[in-house]
Structure formats: structure tokens, C-alpha cells
Amino acid sequence: MVSFELNEEEFKILEDLTNDELIALSKFKDFPICKDIKDQYLLLFLFSKKFDLEKAHTLIKNNLLIREKLEISLPVVKNQVNPELAMKSSSFNIIGYRDNNGCSISYLHPSKAKPKDFTLKEYMTFLLWSQDQSAHDHSSVHRNGMTIIEDLHKISIFKHFDSRLQDFLKKNKLNDMQDVFIGRIQKIYILNPPWVLKPLLSLAKTFMKNKLISRIEICKNDQIFTTIDQSKVLFEYGGTLNLTYIDYFNSLPSNF
């Protein structure tokens, strides 16, 4: 079994920054909205927009608006997360594992949790925590972006599709999720696609850019190992990594 020794006070996103990145960070801190926000969290927004200050400013403004509306802090720490939702392992990432291109690896398995069992705030708190705690990962990971492995086994459009987030964003006049949430998605591998996948992708085009849609690849489990070492992928997704998200979550300090 893999063991973890992650330190809640160690933010590796601050390590090995280039001179250009440090200069951009310094300029970004001059924006009024960035006042009192620690460098490690400002960097999450900057990396998401490749250090384009205006785009990063739009991102942080929208992100903070969502947090304000739902009364969610920046950062979110583990003890603010509903552990029951976390244990469903329907959406998560594990710090320290990368694909062959140096991207972080995230997992989605929507059928493991029913949206009606949790409030929108609980879902958003967990989602934002997953993003905020990525500040503990190295700067190189944030430069490279993320790869998502999504298993759609047993998904039901009636049980597992949640329109609350989309409705909430529209209500607040936020039409592009990439201008709300941090992170740069480089690839999405879809496993066990249902017959409803094409309608879902059509729906996704209403709030996701075509560039992102083009990065989605429907494949079998073994096909993902052309770009990800099998030892870096969890066993339940076809890899050989002897670890569960529950073990990982339980190993983290309460203020991580």
C-alpha cells in the first residue's frame, strides 16, 4: 500500500518559478481583488491562464463571486469538506502522480454519487477544495495542466446528471466554466461510454469551449497507457497503483 507524508504547510507550487512568473505574480498582487490572498493561491489562477494577467483577473473575480454567493472560503481545507461526499470517490485527484507529459491525473466516476443526496454547496466545497489543495503540488504540474480519466460505467442521466451548477452559473451570468474554475485540462479519457454520451457532449458544448471538447477521447482502459504509465493509474481504472482515494483522503491532515 502506498503511504503519504504530505505537509499542510508546504506549498510546492511556490518552488522553481521562472523569473517571468515571479514578475507576473508581483504585478498580479497589485490588483485590488488580490489583496490578502496568499501567493500560492494567486498562482493557481495565474497558471490556469498561462500568466495572462487580465484573464487571470477575470478568473479570480468569477471564482470569488461563486465562493461569496455560497459562503465558501479561499482556501477550502479538508475539515470543511463533507467526508461522506469525499468517500464516494466520484471526483478526485491525488497529489504526486503524473502522466508521461507531466500532467496531474484526476478521476471522475459520476455514478458513485447521486447529486440529490448532497447540497450544491457541499458539492462546490468539495470541488473547490480539490482545486485549492493542488497548491501543494509542484509548479511544473501546474505548467503542464491536467489529464482526466472519466469512467461513465452505470451513469444515468436521470440519477447522476446535476443541472444545479449550470443553473447557478447562468443565474450569476457566468457562461464559461473555464472562467470560473482553476486548472487547464489537456486530455479527457472517457471509459465505458453510455449511449447518451453524444447528447451529453452536445449539451456540454453550451458551456464548454470546442477546444476542450476536442480533447475528449473515448477509449478502452488499456488505451490510456500510451500516455500514462500503468503504475500511476489506480487499480479500479485499469492501472496497478495499489491505492484508494479513501486511503488518500484519510491520510491528509484536517487543515490540508
Swiss-Prot record:
Molecular function via GO: phosphatidylinositol bisphosphate binding
Domain CRAL-TRIO, residue spans: 82-245
Superkingdom in the source lineage: Eukaryota
Entries under SUPFAM superfamilies matching the protein: CRAL/TRIO domain (SSF52087), CRAL/TRIO N-terminal domain (SSF46938)
Membrane spanning stretches: none
PANTHER family documented for this protein: ALPHA-TOCOPHEROL TRANSFER PROTEIN-RELATED (PTHR10174), CRAL-TRIO DOMAIN-CONTAINING PROTEIN DDB_G0278031 (PTHR10174:SF208)
Name of the featured protein: CRAL-TRIO domain-containing protein DDB_G0278031
